[in-house]
């Protein structure tokens, strides 16, 4: 038991170590990081606190890492909160008043903030002021409290759920996109060096191309391949070993996992290729709607295997080809949702 706790603690330390320390270490997202570096440098050169930043995109692509990089670049503290925990003004009050000048206030899943808490944040973002109600009943009064200038960094997987007033208060907004296989291989090379893993370039590329364009997943798979090689291959990691290790996880050569394939084959086998509504699909696959929409669908759509129409989800001819299925019953709908 002590050994297991030690291993978990060690892996947690590596999780932190794998996070890039600055924009120069952040591999991929070249246009985004170039704009962000210019934005931050210009503010610092003027002696100002940088404006508020919003990062949006699928999970696991580095939005949290970018928040840490912003704080490190500014050279101040980082205060972290999660949107679902911020429901009412009192949830924000202590966090906002604790901020020092130049601190970065990071809200993950900012689209899940409560509406009342979100509106309370507006004046804090725009004027660095908040109103506090003193007492209650007929004698209640409101006083305005000045806040130290700070930079808010928001991260969301669903930018469309942000209200326009909140979105408009961000000076910088950037989409974090899926990574190329080449960028992921570079990230894995850095990670393998930090973790002390001896893997050749072909093995790292094999892991990269099955990682769904997602660094977080790539690093997790790298650890799995390490464990597999340790127990089955005498710590030797080449492309063949990587392929065997990933096949054991039921990850195919396109990066599709068991749930991806179940989703596609369910539409093919039970709904003649679609269209099928997301609620029905959620029940059939056994995954909640949010997980399907945030985790699985974006990658399948990116790979051209799935499309969304006004009538529901449909598989594409490419999906039939990849799964080696007959597409005689495939319907053709051009209307996109």
Curated annotation (Swiss-Prot):
Gene3D superfamilies linked: 1.10.8.60, P-loop containing nucleotide triphosphate hydrolases (3.40.50.300), Winged helix-like DNA-binding domain superfamily/Winged helix DNA-binding domain (1.10.10.10)
InterPro entries, A to Z? AAA+_ATPase (IPR003593), AAA_lid_4 (IPR041445), DNA_helicase_Holl-junc_RuvB (IPR004605), P-loop_NTPase (IPR027417), RuvB-like_N (IPR008824), RuvB_C (IPR008823), WH-like_DNA-bd_sf (IPR036388), WH_DNA-bd_sf (IPR036390)
An annotated GO BP: DNA recombination
Stretch list, region Large ATPase domain (RuvB-L): 1-179
What reaction does this enzyme carry out catalytically?
A: ATP + H2O = ADP + phosphate + H(+)
Task: Select a single GO molecular function from the record's annotations and give it.
Answer: four-way junction DNA binding
A Gene Ontology CC term for this entry?
Answer: Holliday junction resolvase complex
Q: Residue span of the signal peptide, if any?
A: none
- Does the keyword Transmembrane helix feature in the UniProt annotation? no
Residues given in the record as Mg(2+) binding sites: 64
Q: Where is this region: Head domain (RuvB-H)?
A: 253-337
- Which domain of life does the protein's organism represent? Bacteria
Notes on the domains: Has 3 domains, the large (RuvB-L) and small ATPase (RuvB-S) domains and the C-terminal head (RuvB-H) domain. The head domain binds DNA, while the ATPase domains jointly bind ATP, ADP or are empty depending on the state of the subunit in the translocation cycle. During a single DNA translocation step the structure of each domain remains the same, but their relative positions change.
Q: What does this protein do?
A: The RuvA-RuvB-RuvC complex processes Holliday junction (HJ) DNA during genetic recombination and DNA repair, while the RuvA-RuvB complex plays an important role in the rescue of blocked DNA replication forks via replication fork reversal (RFR). RuvA specifically binds to HJ cruciform DNA, conferring on it an open structure. The RuvB hexamer acts as an ATP-dependent pump, pulling dsDNA into and through the RuvAB complex. RuvB forms 2 homohexamers on either side of HJ DNA bound by 1 or 2 RuvA tetramers; 4 subunits per hexamer contact DNA at a time.
What quaternary structure, including any partners, is listed in this protein's UniProt entry? Homohexamer. Forms an RuvA(8)-RuvB(12)-Holliday junction (HJ) complex. HJ DNA is sandwiched between 2 RuvA tetramers; dsDNA enters through RuvA and exits via RuvB. An RuvB hexamer assembles on each DNA strand where it exits the tetramer. Each RuvB hexamer is contacted by two RuvA subunits (via domain III) on 2 adjacent RuvB subunits; this complex drives branch migration. In the full resolvosome a probable DNA-RuvA(4)-RuvB(12)-RuvC(2) complex forms which resolves the HJ.
Protein's recorded name: Holliday junction branch migration complex subunit RuvB
């Amino acid at each position: 038991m002590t050994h297991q706790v030690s291993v978990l603690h060690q892996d947690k330390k590596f999780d932190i170590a794998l996070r890039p320390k600055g924009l120069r270490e952040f591999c991929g997202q070249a246009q985004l990081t170039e704009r962000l570096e210019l934005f931050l440098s210009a503010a610092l050169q003027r002696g100002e606190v940088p404006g508020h930043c919003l990062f949006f995109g699928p999970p696991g692509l580095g939005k949290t890492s970018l928040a840490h990089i912003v704080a490190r670049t500014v050279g101040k503290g980082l205060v972290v909160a999660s949107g679902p925990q911020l429901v009412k003004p009192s949830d924000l009050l202590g966090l906002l008043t604790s901020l020092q000048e130049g601190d970065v206030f990071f809200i993950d899943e900012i689209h899940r903030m409560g509406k009342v808490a979100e509106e309370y944040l507006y004046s804090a973002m725009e004027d660095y002021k908040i109103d506090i109600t003193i007492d209650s009943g007929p004698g209640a009064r409101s006083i305005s409290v000045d806040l130290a200038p700070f930079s808010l960094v928001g991260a969301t997987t669903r930018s469309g759920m942000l209200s326009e007033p909140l979105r408009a208060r961000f000076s910088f907004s950037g989409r974090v996109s899926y990574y190329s296989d080449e960028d992921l291989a570079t990230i894995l090379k850095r990670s393998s060096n930090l973790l002390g893993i001896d893997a050749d370039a072909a093995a790292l590329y094999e892991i990269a191309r099955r990682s769904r364009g997602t660094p977080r997943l790539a690093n997790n798979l790298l650890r799995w391949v390490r464990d597999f090689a340790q127990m089955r291959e005498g710590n030797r990691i080449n492309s063949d070993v990587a392929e065997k290790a990933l096949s054991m996880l039921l990850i195919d050569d396109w990066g599709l996992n068991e749930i991806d394939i179940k989703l596609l084959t369910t539409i093919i086998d039970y709904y003649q290729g679609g269209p099928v509504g997301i609620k029905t699909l959620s029940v059939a696959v056994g995954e909640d709607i949010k997980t399907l929409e945030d985790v699985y669908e974006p990658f399948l759509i990116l790979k051209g295997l799935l499309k969304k129409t006004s009538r529901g989800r449909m598989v594409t001819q490419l999906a039939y080809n990849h799964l080696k299925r007959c597409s005689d019953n495939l319907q053709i709908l051009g209307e996109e949702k």
